[in-house]
Curated annotation (Swiss-Prot):
PANTHER family: POLYRIBONUCLEOTIDE NUCLEOTIDYLTRANSFERASE, POLYRIBONUCLEOTIDE NUCLEOTIDYLTRANSFERASE 1, MITOCHONDRIAL. This is Polyribonucleotide nucleotidyltransferase. Signal peptide: none annotated. It catalyses: RNA(n+1) + phosphate = RNA(n) + a ribonucleoside 5'-diphosphate. GO terms for molecular function: 3'-5'-RNA exonuclease activity; magnesium ion binding; polyribonucleotide nucleotidyltransferase activity; RNA binding. The gene is pnp. Its cofactor is Mg(2+). It comes from Rhizobium rhizogenes (strain K84 / ATCC BAA-868). Mg(2+) binds at D487, D493.
Amino acid sequence: MFDIHTVEIEWAGRPLKLETGKIARQADGAVMATYGETVVLATVVSAKSPKPGQDFFPLTVNYQEKTYAAGKIPGGYFKREGRPSEKETLVSRLIDRPIRPLFPEGYKNDTQVVVTVIQHDLENDPDILSMVATSAALTLSGVPFMGPIGGARVGYINGEYVLNPHLDEMDESSLDLVVAGTQEAVLMVESEAKELSEDVMLGAVMFGHRGFQPVIDAIIKLAEVAAKEPRDFQPEDHSALEAEMLSIAEGELRTAYKNTQKAERYAAVDAVKAKVKAHFFPEGVEPKYSAEVIGAVFKHLQAKIVRWNILDTKSRIDGRDLSTVRAIVSEVGVLPRTHGSSLFTRGETQAIVVATLGTGEDEQYVDSLTGMYKERFLLHYNFPPYSVGETGRMGSPGRREIGHGKLAWRAVRPMLPTAEQFPYTLRVVSEITESNGSSSMATVCGTSLALMDAGVPLAKPVAGIAMGLIKEDERFAVLSDILGDEDHLGDMDFKVAGTDGGITALQMDIKIEGITEEIMNVALNQAKGGRLHILGEMAKAISESRGQLGEFAPRIEVMNIPVDKIREVIGSGGKVIREIVEKTGAKINIEDDGTVKIASSSGKEIEAARKWIHSIVAEPEVGQIYEGTVVKTADFGAFVNFFGARDGLVHISQLASERVAKTQDVVKEGDKVWVKLLGFDERGKVRLSMKVVDQATGQELAAKKDDAAE
């Protein structure tokens, strides 16, 4: 019934198994991949023909984690997996980026990749395995795909590169780098690092590329016995059309792209496009080509013209040379009632970034396959349509916004103080108000400025820059701080963020083969120069964190209480802690280890809550004087509440220096009195004295010390 084919290899010390022919047989390609004991199912389905009028390649990648994979039931009211989590969205993008360039130009059939995590051993992250399984499924499917690709994670522990480190090893690693590519070339890099040099980062990329070669060999071996017949796809040849269009439009397009003003340049290009359309769609004559074909070829021609201009003249669309960064204006404190804010403008790219400080109860709970954890640093990136002068949908963030926000998050996180050093939850929101290239890197710069403005003690300021690379035969040009128009025409786009001491995040997408290690090294070092320049411009606004928090930011005081006292502070059903919060106005968060965080914008509220909690958990000291309230009187003395919920007896002989006949002659219930703790009797009962304390001042009466001790 089943025609099963399997290939197994040992990879980075663990078995990797790829199997096809048993599961999901109606998909064009399906592979069950196992690494250690983590299992994913990758499927590929591609329509047999494109939709009429389709002018782009509709590729969708859906990565999904099933909670049963880790023996869990979804949390929340509905016990079913819902909308994609942030990780699912990010891994979907991670798989998409290296496979998209390997589909032939002109292939426009609707294609969907679905990757499902069906078992997780809590040791091997499913993202790398998902990339490998997708590559195998595409290679077997018969869909035109110029793969296979491999992928690997690289760690850097104790000065050594580690291939596919276990999840628990990543805590010790100063690098988390994912690299994917073919046998000959690197196609994609995504990473977070703790201030590593360009050489170490590039070394990690090449180490990973070498590391996944056995995986590519295994996929090829499986394809030799299990691959379907390749589909007959011949991309349309538009070389004659392109040559004809070039003869009409080359001169005017070159002139248009010498215009350094974006709006004027766009108008000039539109005029050339109108001229081209008039040539190919004469009135009263049946056109030889469709509007979609003319549009696609014209777009291709635009890219060629810009590339030729840059390589020939070493001058960019906006008049800059290859390494110049656009003019930068950095401002902080632009929204004075917020906790921290900045406005970062680089050319026609601009971001308003706002930092908000919160308490422990503001932390984000994340329910992952590996377990529930709390995230104390949140970064949200918003890209409204007006930022590029367009109308569009507004609503929940798309994949691009989530991906850009995560890149900025990775860039800044290594410089944040620990929770012990700075016990605040941090939320940063980046509102992109203008965009013409590299809004994610503007977010990195703006986030660094806003956090420093808020008084967050960053180890160092962080800046980011977007780079491009154009290569024609042996000639190449590396572009610093690319424009939106330059973003898609390059052969390598990469974004580098870091401090003056090293790289904290690197994202790289390479679209062609032939980008050598030497070329990447040149590009990374040019990016370093740009990053240092941007850091210098940012320092004109603020160069280090403010010494104090903003006026409207909450203050947090941390105290530690014995673990066995936590129950007393919380009270039955939370009664005590609710009362403290209601009466003092402070927010209180108690950790399982006895760490108590008290937060309020008012120092008085914090102090009131701290004293209250201290009175509950602390033990009264013998010989100390306390203020108390008489709660009960008796013939033999008065009971005084003097230390939180603690009561003690003032014997009738200790009420006053003279002889007292009746307790009520000296005190009544509700009276405020000063008492000294004399000690405890043999049954542990508290012994108090009023007569040794001046009831007007609360000071001890020295002359009476000996009497009280009797």
